[in-house]
Amino acid sequence: MDEIPKWITIKRIGDRPKLDPVNFVALLPLEEVETVLRDDGWTSSGFDDPAELEGEPPVLRMMKPVFLWFVERLHARLWRRNIVVGNVHLDAVRPAAQLPRLLDHVSNHVAGRDYVAKVFAARGYGIEMAYMANETEGHDGYAVKIYKSDRSVWT
């Protein structure tokens, strides 16, 4: 998966840009990805740190509350290329967060990736793990690759 970008740049006000790993690849139309996530309870996300993939903002941002949207949520930023790529993670507010950084959080990229893998697998899509060589402290360097499989066995 060498041709797929490996990093998303996150720009926070007052902070240096940071890199989040690409951990989601779908060989599906963006609209189909969005439909599957919406059917699982995800909604559009307007609250987001500015993010770019190769200089472009995401075409789709979604979130799913796990425990109150501002305490713990699943979060996705997706870009359309000839395929859909992006980052999915579980955000959790840091226990010691205080004003003015009340919403300072940590992101678990593996938990988010694994959650969406299960969502798509449960709907009959094919799932593979693809090594992206983009490890971080909270990420093992793998992306989930989602594709259409013979779904007739599910109908």
Model-derived features: positions:
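A cross-kingdom signal targeting lumenal/periplasmic-facing segments of multi-pass membrane
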Residues: 48-155
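Hydrophobic, Leu/Ile/Phe/Ala-enriched alpha-helical segments that form helix-helix packing faces
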Residues: 33, 37-41, 120
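Terminal, regulation- and interaction-focused segments at domain boundaries
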Residues: 7-36
